[in-house]
Amino acid sequence: MSIDNKLFVTEEDEEDRTQDRADVEDESNDIDMIADENGTNSAIANEQEEKSEEVKAEDDTGEEEEDDPVIEEFPLKISGEEESLHVFQYANRPRLVGRKPAEHPFISAARYKPKSHLWEIDIPLDEQAFYNKDKAESEWNGVNVQTLKGVGVENNGQYAAFVKDMQVYLVPIERVAQLKPFFKYIDDANVTRKQEDARRNPNPSSQRAQVVTMSVKSVNDPSQNRLTGSLLAHKVADEEANIELTWAEGTFEQFKDTIVKEAEDKTLVALEKQEDYIDNLV
């Protein structure tokens, strides 16, 4: 019979039972301590792993910065406020000069209407390809140029830039014009043809006297302002005379020297504080 089933026990048996209970408690305490140590070790391991990931991320950022470092900084200058810089956009495909596309087509004449901001430039036609000289002389008044036409649109905040002597110079762009083919010679030929037909075949009915009723319009008559928007712009452009301009090549270096000289006499002053500028960005 075991000691636990005995009704009466001796002092020796009681001492043995007490010793067994103490041994069991010591074993449970040892198990708890081992569990605590394992938990502490896992927490330390997680913390070390997070630190290693942060260090790795910092290393990756440093590697990216090293891959794309700032090589050099350039002073920035804005000049050319007194210049009138226009940008032309050509809708046609540029010609190839050798294997590279030309910067712009060869221009034989240029015209400008300052009030309407209307540009017209003439480009000589290539008579060696896709050109019917006989038909051009017989039907189109011997046209040998292609006219490009476009209206300059105002653009604020756009600049053209160039680098000289390790400094960047910005020049404000006044207007941008997209130039497209304009077949004026067809309109001129149609007008000439109608005038010749009118001279050859005069209409007697048009020579008859007609009664015309005339009335005086009031100053406040709204019908006087019927031409608005694009219609008014076309009317103004048609009535405005062209200013004939001379197209000059090889003047870019002279233009740059003028801008550099003008920038030397000016100092840029900020219009607002740095804090206000950052607040506007945010």
UniProtKB/Swiss-Prot annotation:
**Residue numbers spanned by region Disordered:** 1-70
Task: Tell me, in one coarse class, where this protein mainly resides.
Answer: nucleus
Q: Which domain of life is it from?
A: Eukaryota
Q: Which ranges are annotated Acidic residues under compositional bias?
A: 10-35, 60-70
Keywords, comma-separated and alphabetical: DNA-directed RNA polymerase, Nucleus, Phosphoprotein, Transcription
* Family matches, as PANTHER family: DNA-DIRECTED RNA POLYMERASE III SUBUNIT RPC5, DNA-DIRECTED RNA POLYMERASES III 80 KDA POLYPEPTIDE RNA POLYMERASE III SUBUNIT 5
- Please explain the role this protein plays, according to its UniProt record: DNA-dependent RNA polymerase catalyzes the transcription of DNA into RNA using the four ribonucleoside triphosphates as substrates. Specific peripheric component of RNA polymerase III which synthesizes small RNAs, such as 5S rRNA and tRNAs. The RPC53/RPC4-RPC37/RPC5 subcomplex is required for terminator recognition and reinitiation.
Identification of the protein by name:
DNA-directed RNA polymerase III subunit RPC5
Taxonomic classification, please?
Eukaryota, Fungi, Dikarya, Ascomycota, Saccharomycotina
